[in-house]
Amino acid sequence: MKLEINKFNYNDPIDGINVITMRPPRHSDKINKGKGPFKAFQVIKNIWIVPERYNFTNNTNDLNIPSEPIMEADAIYNPNYLNTPSEKDEFLQGVIKVLERIKSKPEGEKLLELISSSIPLPLVSNGALTLSDNETIAYQENNNIVSNLQANLVIYGPGPDIANNATYGLYSTPISNGEGTLSEVSFSPFYLKPFDESYGNYRSLVNIVNKFVKREFAPDPASTLMHELVHVTHNLYGISNRNFYYNFDTGKIETSRQQNSLIFEELLTFGGIDSKAISSLIIKKIIETAKNNYTTLISERLNTVTVENDLLKYIKNKIPVQGRLGNFKLDTAEFEKKLNTILFVLNESNLAQRFSILVRKHYLKERPIDPIYVNILDDNSYSTLEGFNISSQGSNDFQGQLLESSYFEKIESNALRAFIKICPRNGLLYNAIYRNSKNYLNNIDLEDKKTTSKTNVSYPCSLLNGCIEVENKDLFLISNKDSLNDINLSEEKIKPETTVFFKDKLPPQDITLSNYDFTEANSIPSISQQNILERNEELYEPIRNSLFEIKTIYVDKLTTFHFLEAQNIDESIDSSKIRVELTDSVDEALSNPNKVYSPFKNMSNTINSIETGITSTYIFYQWLRSIVKDFSDETGKIDVIDKSSDTLAIVPYIGPLLNIGNDIRHGDFVGAIELAGITALLEYVPEFTIPILVGLEVIGGELAREQVEAIVNNALDKRDQKWAEVYNITKAQWWGTIHLQINTRLAHTYKALSRQANAIKMNMEFQLANYKGNIDDKAKIKNAISETEILLNKSVEQAMKNTEKFMIKLSNSYLTKEMIPKVQDNLKNFDLETKKTLDKFIKEKEDILGTNLSSSLRRKVSIRLNKNIAFDINDIPFSEFDDLINQYKNEIEDYEVLNLGAEDGKIKDLSGTTSDINIGSDIELADGRENKAIKIKGSENSTIKIAMNKYLRFSATDNFSISFWIKHPKPTNLLNNGIEYTLVENFNQRGWKISIQDSKLIWYLRDHNNSIKIVTPDYIAFNGWNLITITNNRSKGSIVYVNGSKIEEKDISSIWNTEVDDPIIFRLKNNRDTQAFTLLDQFSIYRKELNQNEVVKLYNYYFNSNYIRDIWGNPLQYNKKYYLQTQDKPGKGLIREYWSSFGYDYVILSDSKTITFPNNIRYGALYNGSKVLIKNSKKLDGLVRNKDFIQLEIDGYNMGISADRFNEDTNYIGTTYGTTHDLTTDFEIIQRQEKYRNYCQLKTPYNIFHKSGLMSTETSKPTFHDYRDWVYSSAWYFQNYENLNLRKHTKTNWYFIPKDEGWDED
């Protein structure tokens, strides 16, 4: 089926086919209340648009603002919206444009195709499948006869909240019992609900926005609608999962957020990181339930059909069945494949990634933002192909979705505020804690309303009642420990045919959908009939709004919310006229609107001590520098402690920033963490349910030998499954009770740090307004303030990174060291009972089994059940920390006492110990593995010195390790031939030193009497990034690793004192080549001996990132040109082969070219052929990632597969230079890195012309051409790659090669 989108205007005439007068499916008077009929437009086959407000589920028949507060803090109401013909036409055009955007990508077209073709299972009448009101809409013909047309989806305008979107299945039972049902969507293409990425993955955004930016983004209405379309798909297939959900505990603590239950259907539909919290047991039940439902429907409905018709032909395609009329059976394998695709591949996050749309990280918003309006019909604001991120408008890197864009109009939510009041239990508990100006001024007599420049004004507590108001969205979200309802861990008696569900059977996450073929699309029957069957059941009627209960709670002490309020500045304060003072007294800040609480003493002193009216730019600049330094130093501070035989890097100011831990150790947050662990961070320490298992049982009776053996094996496998299920339930409880609280703490931390930065901003603006120097300097100072704000925001980001590391490690520790061991105790009892059962069973069947087999099975049972199944740490949904923190690297970093690297264009110690660094004038920064690397050159002034301190001093008994990345250029001359020159040393007759000689790295460790020397093989000579790790166990040995592989070990037990007071010096000492240089990145020193496992993990962390890397190891970049070579044919690059007769040029490999090193070694030339441009990106940092879809351009022409000349299995790669020859130009780039090699593969997507393939090469002679190395897409390689000998089959491995100063071919 070729999907077509019909174009309409609202005033188009009724034609009875695509434009009708529709009777609303919800025609019940109870729900509809006489609404309609409405004009409806069939925009896609079986998909209709009705430009009317969706108001069928509103019991009050009222679109006005609710008279009571609701939980949705970002709702907006306008009862007059979508009333006029012009508004209805605008809505119609808006929805059509969004659908066209969805259709613009193959995945979106597949989704629309699936919805268009997915007719719900009809009823049976007179032996034939017959449509009912569950699959059709009714319309009024000119002769007043009511007829019916097929409809799978009806898209309406928004409901009461004009920025909200929702999906409703018409009937409640069919959405989940396998039948399926027509769906209605209420959709708002012009009114959107923004989201923020306060502590998300896209941190580099502040580098491209020249202002203090709140990272608030507008959703693309295409991704919003696709979310609803996924729900529609679930409804049409009858697999909507509404029986599994999290209930949120609103009564455990008084500061709990009021929140509706979160059904797992929403997590599956949204996808992303939170969907990882869904237990595999629940996934198993979802799949089993769907299979059981479909099996029942086939048996009880489909097999009662006796008449063949078009509907039956269609249903046999939609539901994979085997057999003949009256005896159909479910094709389980095909059904599971389709089910896995619809449930686990189709989701908003996956689809948004394919469309290069930024979506929020979590399904639940931590901070709802007021809605916005945008005219998406303006092609300069929103395009069909790129949405808001229009590259020609300069909106790359998601900048087009930033709320600061001019086309977004912010609209303040007009719903009543949902908040609680927190009041002191005793009226005089503290001095006037409520000082929010918008509230206290309403309660003060006019004669008391005075304006003063002094900052010590206070108001009596009796006047202000001492209460603060806290928004519902800021309260703690905690899941009920029993919210995983309907979890039944019991098992039937084990039989020979018992099946076992394992996690590794879950579907692969192929988000391209390119290999999924929904065959029912080719057999959609087109049926119009006047008489349809009516279902005798209640229509599904959702709840309109979630009402919020305003309450007052009374406290005896200050809370986190008081501390947050004390850091807030009222919006009414004019920063040009009123100076905001920072204070370390929460009481003062709460009682005075011109004071802000801050725990950062140095920064506060710098802010407060400067006189009003700075007189020169020099003083102003120095003041700004001091602010940045103080704020960066104080927010970057960490304390390292040992807890539970582990090392933890604590962010010490979190306690005084948010009033955490005082119940445990007042004023000593670090001590509180050391004593209580994560419980010091939690508002509520939850109980969790430890699942109780009864030992497995087996069937008895007459059994054959093979059946007995099968029962034992199935029981052992089922035991493993039960362990996995219990682990997953425990993980889900942790996510709901611990992880969600940590998310709230992180949101509070970000809010507090942002308010600290805002207080600084207000002071800078005040000083600028009152500047007493040369008036012409103000513009320069304003620019300096803007730059300062960016640096402050980066300090906030770094502080959040430290906080995330700290909190997630505690959270992980609680799961693995508190929860899991308790669960394992019960599981061991379960194993004991199971073992007794199996031993007894085997003994009873010994006469069937024989002595040898009986003994073997008992031994097998004993071995399996005496071995615990480890909890997989990688199964934890580490959400927002994925690209910041690798669990293993995090543990290593806690011992890190030096990390010399580059950040924000400066060389600094990134370890948190803030070493004193002196940098020579000829030290430079260059492109590195991730960001910037340090370039040490051959000149005398290219030197870095790090002063000795207590962290870097190692006694004769102190173990330590050194690890660093090095990129050493290939030699261009023989000046250093045979010369050893130093790279870095802490050496003065004794100490340690790292040198280079003939491209080999040398490690020295020496005291006054003894020394060792280890020389690496020739691994660092060829300009690629290599990880060198040197570990030292003072009682054993020193080991050198290269790229995680152990090179050599030497005994150092006889080496004693190696301490020197000299600095650590980086320089190319004794180097003879003034043009020589070396790049270093992340030079780290650890106060421990890293074991081999940690070294390997440290190296693998580099490859665990999803960056695609060029041949040197640097991240691949969009909009940059590269040479391309295949691993199979070094020295041959890509070129175009002109062939005009077909309007099509082939891409082939060039002739081979070699270069010779100064030492007479020959290599294939890397800079050969034509450069290839990687086109387009909506990535914030412009970097290419695994599974990205890229476009390649050679000589200014797109590369791809021509539709004019194709073969299903083998297709030549070419370009077009005309406008009539289409190319399939998308390549999916796949990460295939190995040690020392940074290659990738380029996958061409499946379409009607060709199968998916891998770009490869082949020496052949096509018709009319010579023998050449042709470049083509091979379906065979794609299908067989995983099973090939990869040392022999390297034709599909491609290197991207940029020109690099470390590799000279001139």
Curated annotation (Swiss-Prot):
Post-translational modification: An interchain disulfide bond is required for toxin stability in an artificial construct with the light chain and translocation domain; which of Cys-461 or Cys-467 forms the disulfide bond with Cys-423 in vivo is unknown.
Source organism superkingdom: Bacteria
InterPro entries assigned: Bot/tetX_LC (IPR000395), Clostridium_toxin_transloc (IPR036248), ConA-like_dom_sf (IPR013320), Kunitz_inhibitor_STI-like_sf (IPR011065), Toxin_rcpt-bd_C (IPR013104), Toxin_rcpt-bd_N (IPR012928), Toxin_trans (IPR012500)
Membrane among keywords: yes
Keywords, comma-separated and alphabetical: Disulfide bond, Host cell membrane, Host cytoplasm, Host cytoplasmic vesicle, Host membrane, Host synapse, Hydrolase, Membrane, Metal-binding, Metalloprotease, Neurotoxin, Protease, Secreted, Toxin, Virulence, Zinc
Stretch list, region C-terminus of receptor binding domain (C-RBD): 1104-1306
One Pfam assignment: Toxin_trans
Residues covered by region (N-terminus of receptor binding domain (N-RBD)): 890-1103
Name of the molecule in the record: Botulinum neurotoxin type X
